[in-house]
Amino acid sequence: MVAAFIDGATATLDFAQYDFHLGDATKTIVAAAIGRAHDRGVRMRITYNVDHPAPMPVPPPSEPDVELISSLPVDGKAIAGIPDLMHHKYVVRDGADVWTGSLNWTDDSWSRQENVIVVVPANPAIAKAYELDFQQLWATEDVMKSGFVDPRYENGLRAWFTPGHGEDLSARISKLIRRARRRVRICSPVITTGPVLGTLAQVIADKTVDVAGCVDATQIREVVQQWNVNRNIYWKLPLLEHVMAGPFTGKNSTPYGAGTVHDFMHAKICVCDDTTFVGSFNLSRSGEKNAENVLEIADARIADRLAAFVDEVRAKYGPVELEPPGRT
């Protein structure tokens, strides 16, 4: 799919990729597609996340293959990304088509994680919104100066970008969760943004709507450990406990470490009745501050399809244990 999308370009490709780290086989396929685009005269640019000289967050962010990126016939800019990550996974093609979702361009992302890919074809208005966000990153090389693109509806779609509209996005998702009358379905590695966490706790307690979802249990436990240390945000813990005790399951992924597999539950989806939010955005306070993107899609068929995907994922795993497995 990646090579096919690149092969469809005739004029421009702009890549905003948080993590770009491929093994020999996949590297050959993707690099060959980029090489063919270069031979066709396609102008290509890439922004990617790199470490910033600041205290390392827990867990630490992924590191792209800078040597691979430098070897490609693409103009590139590294965006310093700690504590606020350049977390996008999108491509804009020919000012008309957009590839986005939760999928990093890594072998583990493609083979070991739950992820979602969204392709928006032939929609210049949505593509323009993504181009504006890309240009902000390209011009400023600063996460905090990006995401200032107005979230306007275009034919049932609305593109959201953070950090410029991070808090607005959390508020919008929270509002639609609260207004839902039939279903709320969520996949997110963590759920820590106050508006969403509080609203979920309320609707689960009220039992007014069918709520269910899946998280990454390992990352949730890491959040609990952080909150036990940082008492300024400890107030969120009872809300998280209430939500996780509801109809949520969790994947016990491999803890992050040098040389470990990255097999996280990585999809980022929120379905509220017939509206879906999907993209790179974890439902987290950090997500509000990162460079992220989300598509808000008002389409019943897409909502049905992604709600079914959430149910498929959550059926694979058991209840969320906030204490590490085996600890008493």
Where are these regions (language model features)?
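Acidic/histidine-rich, surface-exposed loop or edge segments in extracytoplasmic proteins
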Residues: 14-18
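Extracellular glycan-binding segments that recognize GlcNAc-based cell-wall polysaccharides
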Residues: 22
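Active-site cradle of extracellular carbohydrate-active enzymes
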Residues: 146
